[in-house]
Amino acid sequence: MVARTPQKQRKVAMVVPPLNSDLLKETINKVDKCMERLQELQYTIAGGTKVVSGVNLSPRSTRIYLKTSLRCKQETLRIKNATNKKSPVGKFPASSPGDWRKMSLPAMLLGETVNEILQASQVTRDIVDAIAPKKSRKSRRLTMSQEDDGPKTPETQQKSREQNPETVSSNIKARRKKEKQNRRSESDSPPSLQRARSRIAFRTISPQVKGNNGENSFRHLANRVSPKHKPWVKKAVLFPNPLFISGTATQQAKFSRTMSPVIARNEISSIKNNKETPYKFLIKSPPTSASKFQVKIRSPPKVLVSPTRNGSNSVRKSPRGSRSPTRTVNLGKKSASISPIRNTGKRSPKLSTAAKLRRSFTPTRNGSNLARKSSISPKRVTLQAFLSPTRNGNFCKKSPKASISPTRVCNKSQKLSTAAKFRRSFSPSRLAMRFVSPMKSRKSVAKCDDHEMVSGLKQRPVLVPKRFSIRRI
């Protein structure tokens, strides 16, 4: 066995660090170089000229002069207050204390620093001289013992320094590997089991990690979302655009209410039928009207004037039973009563809306009601006069011009009959103006009697008073 030194001696050796004389010598050399430079600077400040590292030095060109210029006042005050104190003993003689005040401040600071460096260097030299002979004696003893007695075991100080916890753990691992190899050779089990046993790696799992592996962990979320782990579940759309969801109106309203970031496609597909075409190929057509003869008037009704008497018969030939083409008449920008001048070019063998409108404004019907104009107040005006062309059929039979009907006029599309010209003067806008001012109505009738072509825009009034406005039905 290898002999080892006792632990007590080893502890003593660790406590006392060995002094390296080489390092101390190098530091002394550096200090000497610094001293040489400082002495050169001191010489230039005193008044001489020296060149340090190729640069001409003058008293005010040095950095030390610029740095210490601010401290000049402080140092002068300190010297005045402490006159009894003497400068440290150095190159400057102690017999002449007044020389410091005569010299400049940087020269004084340089002298003090030089003296301090000299003292430090002297101390280091004394230490080197004290250590050097002891080390030489030890080396002599070792050489003499090796020559006489022969080789001996080396000191274990270096080994103790190198041994770290990492090296200890590596030694333990090496021992375990050797033990495993011995067990493999001794065991009679098949090789496959041996390989399996050697491959098992037992990992220590902390309780925090075990707790995190629950439902709220990120790994669990990733397994839930990805189709790799659950191929039977359809993909969920993260942050879908509600504009491109081709669901029902209720489903879109539900989405805007909840504002949930995740909406599964299978939920939407279960709500609506799968046979629907996708939104990219869906062509939305406008809703078809109930009949061809229905008139759509967008603007709300403002004034409805009927000079005729309300008929007793119910609506029979209207498209929807309750509505008729002349239900609303607007005296604003647009009016529902279409003048016959505009529709002369578009007349067809079928009964157009303009022809239906013209039925309710036959000259006989309007002429009979003009006599009753004074008795009817404008507040009692109703919509029922314009409702249906077949309501006032009894009056058509009594009229002297009953033979000329709008259907007959439609067949004669090229020639403009006198009845159609006469009918122009009985448009609803003109009848409304007749109630407002009878003088204007007489002028307009006189113009129409001369068989002049009057445009539809000139027939309509610009302003209508508010007393004729009737609320919506």
From Swiss-Prot:
Name by which UniProt lists this protein: Microtubule-binding protein TANGLED
Protein source organism: Arabidopsis thaliana (Mouse-ear cress)
Residue ranges with Polar residues bias: 205-216, 307-329
Keyword line: Cytoplasm, Cytoskeleton, Nucleus
PANTHER family from the UniProt entry: MICROTUBULE-BINDING PROTEIN TANGLED-RELATED
Region spans: Required for binding to TAN and location to the cortical division sites (CDS) during cytokinesis: 1-132
Effect of deleting the gene: No visible phenotype.
Tissue specificity note: Strongly expressed in flower buds and root tips.
Keyword DNA repair applies: no
Gene that encodes the chain: TAN
UniProt subcellular location: Nucleus, Nucleolus; Nucleus; Cytoplasm, Cytoskeleton, Phragmoplast
Known role: Is required for spatial control cell division during plant development. Through an association with microtubules, acts both for the positioning of cytoskeletal arrays that establish planes of cell division during prophase and for spatial guidance of expanding phragmoplasts toward preestablished cortical division sites (CDS) during cytokinesis.
Taxonomy of the source species: Eukaryota, Viridiplantae, Streptophyta, Embryophyta, Tracheophyta
Gene Ontology cellular-component terms listed: cytoskeleton; nucleolus; phragmoplast
Positions of the UniProt region annotated as Disordered: 131-218, 290-354
UniProt KW Nucleus keyword: yes
